[in-house]
Amino acid sequence: MSDAQQVPAIVILGQGALDTARRVQARYPGALVHGLAGRVEADRSYTDFGDTLRELYCADRPIVALCAAGIVIRSLAPLLQRKGAEPPVLALAEDGSAVVPLLGGLAGVNRLAREIGEVLAVAPAITTSGELRFGTCVLNPPAGYVLADLEQGKRFVADLLGGQPVRVEGAAGWLDAARLPRDPAAALAIHVTPSARAPRAEELLIHPRCVLAALE
């Protein structure tokens, strides 16, 4: 996802959501507020809410929709059967009283929800099991790193949630504060390495992006 794509699109339906939208917008330089034509004066106007959300979703843009979660889900439902990566999508109450991550757990939606929650002084409604238990999403490493195999990573997290301990090999400072069940003799391992190889069984392999690009 490029820097431009990382900036969320803030979508509102009416004037009542504009103040909250502007507060969120101030947190993300370059973000635009999209408002329904004829109802609210925003940075950009649209005429069909569902079409707008689907266009943003297909363009891999993070979406912050100030409306009921059900409206967002129904609008994006035709696209959700497709396999592949999805951008962060969250619903936000018009008055800023609730922040609900909906889609994009592996694309940083919970991080986005926490950032917006800080702006609005509310706790986001995070439901991701791994993140609630460990305090982080191990399948969403920070910028500059990439998973070697997402599908194996999902199985790895299932084993962690099942109670298996883990050891960490390599420089993974972002995991220092994570509540992982660490054991230096564990069979499961999170391994951060520039070595371009296939992950071994019981291993979550993470590569630095810059080194991976050089090897390619």
Positions of predicted regions on the chain:
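SAM-dependent methyltransferases
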Residues: 1-63, 68, 75-88, 92-216
